Amino acid sequence: MISTDQKRKLISSFVTGDDLSTSDPYDVWKTRFGCWSKKLYAKNRFIALPLVAAITIIDVYFNNTLRLAYKKQEYPIVRALSAQVLINLYQLDGDEQHLNTAKQHLDWLLSESCLGYSGPCWGLGFKWVVSDTLTYDENTPLTTATPYILEAFIRY
């Protein structure tokens, strides 16, 4: 049985790195081909269904482990959740290093916020096709990310 201290060290090892790049379950849909396929599907589901079904099956069952043709990426939500984990660890053991590393994540978030808005905000960090007429670019803030980041700043 793994001890509580060992669990904390294991968790800490995941959230203390300088580079938190990771794969995303939706990697296939942020590729140029994936975006094109989603737009086609949004325009005509009957024509595009075999294509997007094939893409999904290949990605889930054959490429899920290998992640071929996908590049790992830093995501604001990963940094925010890592900062919150470190704040939790600090509250448990009082180790200042957890708080220092949480601050590094928060500094990264400030430097990587979406540009051109009235205040800091964050999005996915990649193009996301919503419909055949609406595509969010890499710099579009979304409510799916910003609240977690705001919570990390408030808790710090």
Features from the language model and the residues they span:
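Glycan-recognition and catalytic cores of secretory/periplasmic carbohydrate-active enzymes
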Residues: 1-156
